[in-house]
Amino acid sequence: MAATILTAGCGKPSTPSGGAVAPPADNTAMAATPISQPALTAWRQGDKAGAVAGFLAADWSAHPLFAADSALSLSESQFKALSDADRQAKSTELTTQLGVFKQLAAAVTQAGQEAAAKGDPAQARKCFTALKQCGAALAGPDSSSLVQLVGQALSKRADTELGKLPQ
């Protein structure tokens, strides 16, 4: 019993009596890689193409969007509950992190515009659709007001660009 608890706590499946491993009943209990992490990591490493590819591959309807320790992961109520000093520190962190994220989103927009200019509306649509899905995710109720505003702006930009593409 103790071995089962210890191995389950490490994220390793236990195999009672050597039988097949059953999948966990609740996948949300496992720590998931934040959706934005692969794209943001590539961006920070200077890999623009990899960052855009990671952004396009992301499932923006999944969670968590950002790492738990990121200011971007705070809801508005969590942000307001911080002490004045912590709120100021998180505000600075939030502004910096949003700046990086907006640069990545601009690169995705640019990739879509370049695809459209080269006569590849399918790739352009993929870029703008990912941008719109990201915007919708950021604009959700689990985000801070500032992150929601950025999400709304991304969705609006995506709609504008999608409207320019041939049907």
Where on the chain are the PLM-derived regions?
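Sec-dependent N-terminal signal peptides
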Residues: 1-2
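C-terminal motif of bacterial Sec signal peptides marking the signal peptidase cleavage site
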Residues: 6-9
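Short, conserved catalytic or interaction motifs in soluble domains
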Residues: 12
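Aromatic-rich surface patch/π-platform used for binding flat ligands and interfaces
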Residues: 15-167
